[in-house]
C-alpha cells in the first residue's frame, strides 16, 4: 500500500497538533476544580469521567500525522497507569510541555540528540530529589488522605482506608458494582475459594443453604474419592474425636458421596465435601497453600501418599469453615506462622519474576488469601452514568493508595515538582544544547501547578513564583485558594505516581524531538454505495 511522507519541521508540527489535541482534552480534569469529559460509547450510555487514561484511550484523530502524535502521548498515559495506576493526566500534561518547549529549541537549530541528553540528566536529578522529600505512609489517616485526594471525595478515602486496615497491605481489594444506591465495604476474612459443596444435603443451615463447621479437621487431596473404604479409617478416628470434617478433593462421587450424605442426614457424622479449586498446576499450588494455612498435608498421588494411610496429624485444622453453593471460606487456619511467612515470601518472589499479567494477578490473589483476606468495595449510584464515573474514581484512588504504601508520599498539587526545580537548575553542562535540555525540564516542571491554578480560574505564574519562594512543602490549595503546608493539610500525592509521570513523559517526549521524518498510510476513500434499484424485476 502506498505511503505519505513528511519531513523535518513539517512532520514534527503535524504530530504536535495531535499531541495538543489529546493533552488539551485531558488536562481540563486536573486538580480539585478540574472538570469532567464525556466519552461517547457505541453501546450504552456515555461515560463521564476525569480519568486521564480512559479519556486518552478513546481519542483517535482523522489526520494520520496528528494521530501519530496523539498515540505517542497516549503511551505516556497508559504506561503511567500500568506502573502507578494514577497520575495519567499529569503525565500527559508534562509530555505536552516537554514537546512544546523542546520543539521551540529544535526549530531554532538546536541538536535534538544533545537536548535529549540534557532532558535525561534533569529528569534523573528531579527523581532523586523527589525521593529525598518523600515521607513514608504512616497509618490509616495518611492512606485516607491519599485516596481522598485522588478521588476528590473524602468518603471514598475513608472507605479505602478501612479496607486496607482490614485486609492489610498485601490483601486484595476488589471493586464491584452494587445493586443499591450506596457504596459499601464487604470484607471476607480468611481464605476464600470459588468452590461450593458437592451436594446441597450437606448444608447445616437449611434456611441460608450454608454449611458451617466449627473447629473441623480438613482432608486435602488431589485424588478422586469414589470408594468409602479409602477414607473409612480416618473417618472412624474423626468420629471418635467428636469432630467435623471438610474434604477438599478433585471430586467425590458414587458410594463415598452417598455414605457421607446418609450419615449427615441421620445425624451420625457431619462432613462437607468440596471440589479442589483451580486447574492443573495452579490447583496443586492452591492445595499446598490451603495445607500450609491449616497445618495439614496434601495427600497427593505423585508423592505416593495413600488415603487409607492418612492419620489425624496429616489433616489441617481451622477455627471455622463456611461453605455455600459457590464458595468456601476457611477462617483462622491453624498452620505454623513461620511456614505461612515462608510461603508468602516464595509467592512474592514469583510475582517479581513473572512477566505475564494474568499470572501476576493470580499470584497476587493467592498472596492475599494467605496474608490477610479479600475486601470488596461495592459501588452504588442513582444512575448507570454516575456509577461508571464513581467506579473509575475509586479504581484510581485504590491504585494511588497502593503506590503510596510502596514508595511513600510527597506534597501534592504539583508542589513536589516546584520544590525540586532549585536542585535541577544547579545542573550544568559544557555542551550548550544539553544545557537547553535541562532548561526544558525546569520549565516543564511548573506545568502541573500552572494547570491546577488555571482550572481553578486563577493565574498560574503568580502562584508558581510564590510557591518557589516558600519553604519546601508549602503549596497552593486550589480548592480554598490559599497557601498551606501540603502534607499537614492532607494534600499529598504518592511518590511513585509523581516519579512515574515525569519519567514516562520525558521518555516519550525526548524521543519525539529526535523525529526527522514521518511515514503514514494514504487514507483509502470508501467507494459510494450504489443506489438501490427502483423497479420491480419481471414486471411491465
From Swiss-Prot:
Annotated InterPro entries: Chaperonin_Cpn60_CS, Cpn60/GroEL, Cpn60/GroEL/TCP-1, GroEL-like_apical_dom_sf, GROEL-like_equatorial_sf, TCP-1-like_intermed_sf
CDD domains: GroEL
Predominant localisation class: cytoplasm
GO biological process, any: protein refolding
Record keywords: ATP-binding, Chaperone, Cytoplasm, Isomerase, Nucleotide-binding
Gene Ontology MF term list: ATP binding; ATP-dependent protein folding chaperone; isomerase activity; unfolded protein binding
Entry EC no(s): 5.6.1.7
PROSITE patterns: CHAPERONINS_CPN60
Superkingdom of source: Bacteria
Residues that hold ATP according to the record: 29-32, 86-90, 413, 477-479, 493
Complex formation: Forms a cylinder of 14 subunits composed of two heptameric rings stacked back-to-back. Interacts with the co-chaperonin GroES.
Function: Together with its co-chaperonin GroES, plays an essential role in assisting protein folding. The GroEL-GroES system forms a nano-cage that allows encapsulation of the non-native substrate proteins and provides a physical environment optimized to promote and accelerate protein folding.
Family classification: Belongs to the chaperonin (HSP60) family.
Protein name stated in the entry: Chaperonin GroEL
Originating species: Clostridium botulinum (strain Eklund 17B / Type B)
